């Protein structure tokens, strides 16, 4: 039978990936096959009790004193005396916590150790004269070979009898004490519940000698009347209720009368269990211990914090006076303590707001849920020394001082306790934040493709991002029902409102255009098929039929192919290098020329040359440039002259450099002439300006003619370039490029965006 363990779903409120459900394999099952009879420990109690009292099987079915787990009256069991994997609610405590073992020695503290945790709680034991009867081991019980059920020790705190098969837990786990009539009638015994926990060493000191003598007398009476706790049960044990934690004494040493109101009462699960899991005694005792420790720690911290007003007296005789002074100063201190408490996070409400659990340490739930997102820092738990000195956890910010109380850093992880509000919150988080989570998030389990067509879903017309899209096929079973859901009482409740959890789509798209009818001859004996098969299987050879000759031939063929490819790459690289070199050199040369012309136009002294009209064309040089640009755009010009040839003459650059030098010298001479002209008359100035303008106009005309007369380069047939200009969209006449203009006409920068298609 496959038993599914309850697991968490992948909800955002629990901050973690979902645990993949796996069927139990042979590796995960425990080693060694145990029969169903040995898997529970209830048969040990029932069999021993039946052997003692001679109870028949018919009475077992109707008896309520037997274990509820293996009886026929239990509704959970399908068969008579066998278990089916379901635990009754009252018996969960027998399987969740291992019963603690106690060994009490003289003048030593008894250490209560449990196999579940590494914690150890210390209880002080009184000076027991000859308490060897309280020392238990499994060897004493094994000698009796389980012929009789031994009486539960009365003076012990929590005892357990270990057998060869399984540890028989006492009734302390289920908040009941089984008291035999002989012991209850002879002496008022101490209850083994939480109210009978022996006082600690710190509280044992202020007890008076009278209390110590009374305890010693009761223990001696116990040892004399009941010499050894090997008392047989001759009747049905009486069940006595345990006192609740509210009405227990502050010293926790009060005794409860052993006689109950009813001598025989049936075991009812509803009244026996006060908390989930049947761990009432464990949690109440743990809460009482932690409360006591926290109260003592609070007192110690108060003494250390607010002891600066109290005068320290070394002698012991003045201790009474210091106590009286401290009592007088307590009222005056209250205002200061209230101010400090307002600033510090020491009030319980502020601790609760900071998720500081003061009454319980939820160690099991915090260990089971390790946070995935935030790194967890290891901190020491809050412990108390025997000398009542607070152990502050060593932290980085220890510079604040040891006098300030520091609460331990509690790494909070949410528990698995599910309520109605938590279920609603998880559902709202899933439905609301599904549209906000990105697809590439590590923690998001919803994968949304980029090119999503807005499909009309059942709920809304927009595309819901919470829908699941098929991805890579996986062999895991959880890929089938990979949808947002919540587990409540081991039942998966889906949160998606869609009818189908997986988006219905075609996995295999068949192209109908490629389908054609095949005759039986063509389908089998087609020449295309033979050619394709020969090409696909040309490099194939069976591993058993390969020879060394075939390997040599393949190596030679591969080497030849690599050599041919390398040669082709070298030639193509050389061609591209030459083309780019030529292109860049021509562009740089044109930009140098354009910048020189722009500098001349922007110069206010030489700007008059471009704006004055010439006598031949009756227009300025600037207007001539614009006219040439417009005529070039309107005409069906040829392609650009940049790639007309691969080689570029070095004479062009030399001529441009010479032109630049001549222009600079002329400008300097003109500046000198202007300085001299300022001293002369106005008539001389006009004559000099006319001469200078004519000289500059001639030089500019010479440059334009030289650039226009450059011999065109030879064209390569294997390179075709089409250039597009932004004017082609408005008018097809402007389909040519800006770069295709003659170099002598272009007077502006070439940095305009140009789309180039090679």
Curated annotation (Swiss-Prot):
<dbReference type="GO" id="GO:0005637">
    <property type="term" value="C:nuclear inner membrane"/>
</dbReference>
<dbReference type="GO" id="GO:1903473">
    <property type="term" value="P:positive regulation of mitotic actomyosin contractile ring contraction"/>
</dbReference>
<dbReference type="GO" id="GO:1901900">
    <property type="term" value="P:regulation of protein localization to cell division site"/>
</dbReference>
<feature type="region of interest" description="Disordered">
    <location>
        <begin position="636"/>
        <end position="702"/>
    </location>
</feature>
<feature type="compositionally biased region" description="Low complexity">
    <location>
        <begin position="315"/>
        <end position="330"/>
    </location>
</feature>
<feature type="region of interest" description="Disordered">
    <location>
        <begin position="314"/>
        <end position="414"/>
    </location>
</feature>
<dbReference type="GO" id="GO:0005886">
    <property type="term" value="C:plasma membrane"/>
</dbReference>
<feature type="compositionally biased region" description="Acidic residues">
    <location>
        <begin position="651"/>
        <end position="689"/>
    </location>
</feature>
<keyword id="KW-0175">Coiled coil</keyword>
<feature type="compositionally biased region" description="Basic and acidic residues">
    <location>
        <begin position="690"/>
        <end position="702"/>
    </location>
</feature>
<dbReference type="GO" id="GO:0005934">
    <property type="term" value="C:cellular bud tip"/>
</dbReference>
<feature type="compositionally biased region" description="Polar residues">
    <location>
        <begin position="400"/>
        <end position="414"/>
    </location>
</feature>
<dbReference type="GO" id="GO:0045185">
    <property type="term" value="P:maintenance of protein location"/>
</dbReference>
<feature type="modified residue" description="Phosphoserine">
    <location>
        <position position="25"/>
    </location>
</feature>
<feature type="region of interest" description="Disordered">
    <location>
        <begin position="55"/>
        <end position="77"/>
    </location>
</feature>
<dbReference type="GO" id="GO:0005935">
    <property type="term" value="C:cellular bud neck"/>
</dbReference>
<dbReference type="GO" id="GO:0032177">
    <property type="term" value="C:cellular bud neck split septin rings"/>
</dbReference>
<dbReference type="GO" id="GO:0032153">
    <property type="term" value="C:cell division site"/>
</dbReference>
<comment type="similarity">
    <text>Belongs to the AIM44 family.</text>
</comment>
<feature type="coiled-coil region">
    <location>
        <begin position="648"/>
        <end position="711"/>
    </location>
</feature>
<dbReference type="GO" id="GO:0032174">
    <property type="term" value="C:cellular bud neck septin collar"/>
</dbReference>
<dbReference type="GO" id="GO:0098841">
    <property type="term" value="P:protein localization to cell division site after cytokinesis"/>
</dbReference>
<feature type="compositionally biased region" description="Polar residues">
    <location>
        <begin position="355"/>
        <end position="368"/>
    </location>
</feature>
<protein>
    <recommendedName>
        <fullName>Altered inheritance of mitochondria protein 44</fullName>
    </recommendedName>
</protein>
<keyword id="KW-0597">Phosphoprotein</keyword>
<dbReference type="GO" id="GO:1990344">
    <property type="term" value="P:secondary cell septum biogenesis"/>
</dbReference>
<feature type="compositionally biased region" description="Polar residues">
    <location>
        <begin position="338"/>
        <end position="348"/>
    </location>
</feature>
């Amino acid at each position: 039978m496959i038993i599914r363990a309850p697991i968490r779903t992948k909800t955002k409120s629990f901050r973690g990936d979902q645990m993949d459900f796996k069927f139990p394999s042979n590796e995960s099952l425990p080693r060694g096959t145990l029969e169903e009879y040995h898997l529970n420990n209830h048969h040990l109690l029932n069999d021993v009790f039946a052997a003692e009292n001679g109870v028949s099987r018919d009475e077992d079915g109707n008896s309520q004193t037997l274990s509820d787990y293996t009886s026929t009256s239990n509704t959970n069991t399908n068969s008579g005396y066998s278990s089916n994997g379901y635990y009754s609610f009252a018996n969960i405590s027998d399987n969740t916590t291992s019963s603690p073992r106690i060994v009490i020695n003289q003048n030593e503290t008894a250490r209560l150790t449990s196999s579940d945790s590494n914690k150890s709680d210390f209880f002080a034991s009184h000076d027991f004269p000859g308490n060897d009867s309280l020392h238990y081991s499994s060897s004493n019980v094994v000698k009796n070979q389980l012929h009789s059920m031994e009486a539960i020790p009365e003076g012990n705190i929590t005892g357990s009898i270990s057998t060869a098969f399984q540890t028989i837990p006492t009734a302390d786990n289920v908040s009941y004490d089984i008291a035999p009539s002989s012991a209850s009638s002879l002496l008022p015994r101490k209850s083994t519940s939480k109210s009978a926990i022996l006082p600690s060493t710190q509280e044992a000191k202020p007890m008076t000698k009278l209390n110590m003598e009374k305890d010693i007398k009761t223990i001696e009476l116990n040892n004399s009347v009941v010499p050894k706790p090997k008392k047989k049960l001759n009747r049905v044990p009486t069940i006595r209720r345990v006192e609740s934690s509210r009405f227990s004494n502050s010293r926790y040493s009060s005794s409860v009368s052993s006689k109950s109101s009813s001598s025989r009462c049936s075991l009812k699960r509803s009244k026996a269990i006060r908390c989930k899991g049947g761990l009432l005694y464990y949690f109440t005792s743990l809460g009482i211990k932690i409360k006591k420790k926290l109260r003592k720690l609070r007192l110690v911290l108060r003494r250390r914090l607010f002891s600066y007003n109290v005068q320290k007296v070394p002698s012991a005789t003045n201790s009474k006076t210091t106590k009286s002074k401290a009592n007088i100063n307590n009222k005056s201190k209250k205002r200061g303590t209230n101010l400090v408490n307002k600033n510090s996070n020491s009030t319980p409400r502020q601790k609760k707001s900071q998720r500081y659990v003061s009454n319980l340490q939820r160690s099991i739930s915090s260990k089971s849920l390790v946070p995935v997102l935030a790194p967890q820092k290891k901190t020491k738990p809050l412990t108390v020394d025997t000398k009542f000195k607070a152990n502050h956890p060593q932290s980085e910010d220890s510079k604040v001082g040891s006098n300030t109380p520091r609460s331990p850093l509690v790494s909070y992880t949410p528990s698995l306790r599910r309520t109605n509000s938590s279920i609603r919150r998880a559902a709202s988080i899933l439905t609301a934040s599904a549209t906000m989570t990105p697809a590439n998030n590590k923690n998001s389990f919803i994968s949304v493709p980029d090119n999503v067509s807005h499909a009309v879903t059942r709920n809304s017309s927009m595309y819901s991002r919470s829908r699941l899209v098929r991805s890579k096929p996986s062999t895991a079973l959880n890929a089938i029902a990979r949808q947002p859901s919540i587990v409540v009482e081991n039942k998966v409740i889906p949160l998606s409102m869609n009818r189908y959890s997986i988006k219905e789509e075609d996995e295999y798209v068949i192209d109908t255009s490629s389908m054609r009818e095949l005759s039986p001859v063509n389908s089998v004996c087609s020449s295309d098929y033979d050619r394709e098969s020969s090409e696909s299987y040309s490099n194939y050879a069976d591993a058993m039929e390969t020879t060394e000759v075939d390997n040599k031939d393949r190596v030679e063929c591969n080497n030849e192919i690599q050599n041919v490819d390398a040669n082709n790459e070298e030639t193509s690289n050389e061609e591209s290098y030459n083309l780019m070199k030529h292109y860049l050199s021509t562009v740089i040369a044109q930009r140098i020329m354009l910048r020189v012309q722009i500098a001349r136009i922007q110069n206010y002294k030489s700007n008059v040359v471009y704006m004055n009209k010439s006598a031949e064309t009756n227009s300025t040089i600037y207007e001539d440039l614009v006219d040439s640009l417009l005529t070039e755009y309107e005409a069906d010009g040829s392609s650009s002259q940049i790639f007309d040839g691969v080689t570029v003459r070095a004479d062009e650059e030399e001529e441009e450099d010479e032109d630049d030098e001549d222009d600079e010298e002329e400008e300097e001479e003109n500046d000198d002439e202007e300085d001299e002209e300022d001293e002369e008359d106005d008539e001389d100035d006009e004559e000099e300006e006319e001469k200078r303008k004519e000289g500059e106009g001639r030089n500019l005309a010479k440059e334009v003619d030289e650039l226009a007369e450059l011999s065109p380069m030879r064209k390569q047939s294997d390179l075709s370039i089409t250039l597009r200009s932004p004017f082609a969209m408005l008018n097809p006449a402007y389909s040519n490029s800006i770069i295709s203009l003659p170099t002598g006409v272009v007077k502006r920068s070439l940095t305009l965006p140009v789309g180039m298609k090679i």
